[in-house]
């Protein structure tokens, strides 16, 4: 396994003379990940150059044939060894997630647990969805694509790329992984776990870097596919790039402007807690986070909103290392925090009513307080995903209007209803257009034993999680006759000698 961009100096060893750059050589571009709660560097190292990206793809190509011919049981064995290696590194990996991404320790530990749990789920999914099967005289088998690229996001720097990498390797592909530039240390530790699990060299290549490194990987002519989790803007750019190469598989898992409808719940406390977790987990940086809160106009809706605001004000926000532990850490960077606050300012300028303003809690960091704006009177609301702890409230006169508002988006990732009436949920489930629809459950709760993906501009109909096996291989249908014989009947005009 190769780690392009690995900082040798981080090992505390002197550089060998052959690796000391001469004064005449151009400087190697470097980048750093920063702790979003403090602004301090966590990891510093070189970004992979286009030549290094090409070399990584070439190594993955060379490793593909032997890896794809490795018995499936042996690949499963390596995957299970990887799960054990993650458990051994659980604390170190969670610490890296907290420092690079800002997740509280409880949340970072949960992510590592989810990474390890992905192994058995992927093995089960592959067995169910990619097993050879027969139908009459035909048999269908599944083959890996070849070399696939995986682009990882920052919000789940371990879990989400893992959700592509594990099923891809299990199917027999080799992978070139470009992690988020915000979480290179998490990627290094994950790659080390794969190495300790016995993954052969070249089967997983890691190329560190930001936009230029990613662009070099996208432009590689020797890729057979790319699996991406991230913003809709980047996803649309990738779709355009891949439009002229239909022979390459492209799986896009994008964001959403997700609606959560709260409709006359009897238990205001439970409804408010579910809404808080839907809107503000991971500082509002989960792609399934609620962005729009839809409630009935009138006293009952007002009562819920009042209770919700009281609860939101009590949330503990802070650095992951603080004691007692916070519910919510920072957004990924000070720049990201500025973007959330700029979006809030723009909505206020259009007529939104501030019910709970999101504020910067510490200069030059990503620490923000949760926000809630009433945008009912804003007629020109942008259909955009605000990636942070800012929720927009919309009051509607009836449930028909709630359904219409829920569908008023070009996205379609997640949607939820909090209500006691099962008949309302039956309507919601059947009429709202989204790939993930929850009832009396936080939007940020998804099952690895089910598909994960959206419609509209939230993806390209390549759901991940339990259905990731589908885009990690392709079917080959064969009609096979072991003994060559003359057909019993021949078409008219065809007479054998």
Regions found by a protein language model. Name each.
Residues 42-48, 63-69, 150, 260-263, ...:
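Short, well-ordered beta-strand elements within core beta-sheets of diverse protein domains
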Residues 234-377, 439, 488, 495-496:
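ALDH superfamily catalytic-core signature
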């Amino acid at each position: 396994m190769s780690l392009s961009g690995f900082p040798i100096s981080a090992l505390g060893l002197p550089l060998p003379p052959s690796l000391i750059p001469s004064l005449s050589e151009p400087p190697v571009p470097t980048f750093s990940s920063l702790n979003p709660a403090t602004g301090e560097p966590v990891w510093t190292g070189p970004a992979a150059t286009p030549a290094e990206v090409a070399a990584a793809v070439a190594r993955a190509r060379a490793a593909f044939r032997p890896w794809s011919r490795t018995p499936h049981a042996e690949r499963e064995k390596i995957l299970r060894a990887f799960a054990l290696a993650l458990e051994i590194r659980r604390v170190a990996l969670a610490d890296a997630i907290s420092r690079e991404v800002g997740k509280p320790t409880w949340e970072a530990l949960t992510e590592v647990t989810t990474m390890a749990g992905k192994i058995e789920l992927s093995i089960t999914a592959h067995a169910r969805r990619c097993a050879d099967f027969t139908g009459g005289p035909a048999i269908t088998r599944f083959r890996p694509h070849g070399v696939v690229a995986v682009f990882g996001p920052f919000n789940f720097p371990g879990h989400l790329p893992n959700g592509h990498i594990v099923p891809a390797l299990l199917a027999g592909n080799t992978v070139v992984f470009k992690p988020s530039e915000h979480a290179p240390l998490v990627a290094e530790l994950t790659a080390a776990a794969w190495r300790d699990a016995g993954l052969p060299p070249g089967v997983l290549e890691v190329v560190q870097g930001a936009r230029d490194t990613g662009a070099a990987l996208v432009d590689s002519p020797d890729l057979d596919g790319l699996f991406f989790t991230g913003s809709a803007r980047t996803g649309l750019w990738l779709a355009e790039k891949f439009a002229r190469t239909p022979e390459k598989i492209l799986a896009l898992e994008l964001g959403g402007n997700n609606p959560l409808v709260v409709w006359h719940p009897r238990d205001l406390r439970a409804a408010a807690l579910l809404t808080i977790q839907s809107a503000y987990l991971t500082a509002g940086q989960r792609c399934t986070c609620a962005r729009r809160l839809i409630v009935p106009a009138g006293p009952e809706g007002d009562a819920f909103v009042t209770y919700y605001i009281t609860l939101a004000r009590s949330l503990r926000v802070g650095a992951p290392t603080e004691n007692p532990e916070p519910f919510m850490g920072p957004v990924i960077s000070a720049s990201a925090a500025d973007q959330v606050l700029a979006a809030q300012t723009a909505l206020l300028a259009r007529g939104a009513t501030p019910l709970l303003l999101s504020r910067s809690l510490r200069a030059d960091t990503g620490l923000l307080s949760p926000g809630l704006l009433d945008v009912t009177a804003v007629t020109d609301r942008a259909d955009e995903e605000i990636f942070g702890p800012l929720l927009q409230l919309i009051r509607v006169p009836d449930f028909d209007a709630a359904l219409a508002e829920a569908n008023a988006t070009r996205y379609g990732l997640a949607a939820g209803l909090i209500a006691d009436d099962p008949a309302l949920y039956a309507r919601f489930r059947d009429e709202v257009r989204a790939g993930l629809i929850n009832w009396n459950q936080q939007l940020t709760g998804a099952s690895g034993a089910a598909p994960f993906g959206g419609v509209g501009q939230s993806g390209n109909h390549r759901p991940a999680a339990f259905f990731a096996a589908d885009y990690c291989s392709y079917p080959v249908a064969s009609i096979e006759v072991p003994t060559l014989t003359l057909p019993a009947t021949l078409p008219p005009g065809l007479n054998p000698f």
